[in-house]
Amino acid sequence: MVLIRVLANLVILQLSYAQKSSELVIGGDECNINEHRFLVALYDSTTRNFLCGGVLIHPEWVITAKHCNKKSMVLYLGKHKQSVKFDDEQERFPKEKHFIRCNKPRTRWGEDIMLIRLNKPVNNSEHIAPLSLPSNPPIVGSVCRVMGWGSINKYIDVLPDEPRCANINLYNYTVCRGVFPRIPKKSKILCAGDLQGRLDSCHCDSGGPLICSEEFHGIVYRGPNPCAQPDKPALYTNIFDHLHWILSIMAGNATCYP
């Protein structure tokens, strides 16, 4: 009888440990405080609810996902813990918002991108600096890093106080076509994740970066529901495929794709 109780307690402890570990790795582990100086936190300025992540690419410009757009938004730069404010944290508001096809209500596959011009440039500091745009297309098979304040529980939204980081793999586009059969044969989408279902971006990570070879290659777009399922990677908007549009907008030479 005693042996049965001991074995039962060991099983309970193992199940408890497995559950806690699973919850922790959906959004990864806490990011190093110095590795995400470009990471932006987007909030609804009316409700003050957290919306999405974003990426600083220039002192005056931020990239995020189009589906993160709200009429009233505020952006925080230089933030780590949501509950603690750094001395160099800066608050900004959108001065301009640019979309791929601004006269089209529907977003095409791979075009879930929004370029925000800030109302005032930010200053580089200990916790704030832009991330480099890609110089070449990403390489399938690369290990990339995803980060954000998204949910750490795949079934209900449990947002962490600090951003989580995870290393995931970049897969061939055909892998994601098997998971999302509605996506076209060709699109401006990257396919990345962990086929064992241990690591994944999740709810509220939208708009955050996928970083490969220390360059900004993808925006968190969408994934399986619930997150972090085996053999089901997530979709990321491909930054390199939109590079000409991004640079043209920043230079004042373009507005929308036709």
From Swiss-Prot:
What keyword terms does UniProt attach to this protein?
Blood coagulation cascade activating toxin, Disulfide bond, Glycoprotein, Hemostasis impairing toxin, Hydrolase, Protease, Secreted, Serine protease, Signal, Toxin, Zymogen
Glycosylation positions in this chain: 123, 172, 253
Q: Which residues cross the membrane?
A: none
**Compartment annotation:** Secreted
Which domain of life, per UniProt? Eukaryota
Chief subcellular location: secreted
Q: Give me the disulphide-bonded residues.
A: 31-165, 52-68, 102-256, 144-212, 176-191, 202-227
Which tissues and organs express this gene's product?
Expressed by the venom gland.
Catalytic activity annotated for this protein? Selective cleavage of Arg-|-Xaa bond in fibrinogen, to form fibrin, and release fibrinopeptide A. The specificity of further degradation of fibrinogen varies with species origin of the enzyme
Q: Per the database record, which ranges form the Peptidase S1 domain? A: 25-251
User: What InterPro entries is this protein classified in?
Assistant: Peptidase_S1_PA, Peptidase_S1_PA_chymotrypsin, Peptidase_S1A, Trypsin_dom
Gene Ontology BP annotations: proteolysis
Query: What is one GO cellular-component annotation here?
Result: extracellular region
Q: Which GO terms describe its molecular function?
A: serine-type endopeptidase activity; toxin activity
Q: Which residues form the active site?
A: 67 (charge relay system), 112 (charge relay system), 206 (charge relay system)
- EC number(s): the record gives 3.4.21.74
Ribosomal protein keyword on record:
no
Quaternary data: Monomer.
Q: What does this protein do?
A: Thrombin-like snake venom serine protease. Cleaves fibrinogen (FGA) to split of fibrinopeptides AM, AO, and AY; the aberrant fibrinogen is then incapable of being cross-linked, forming easily dispersible clots.
Q: In which family does this protein belong, per the annotation? A: Belongs to the peptidase S1 family. Snake venom subfamily.
Q: What is this protein called?
A: Thrombin-like enzyme ancrod-2
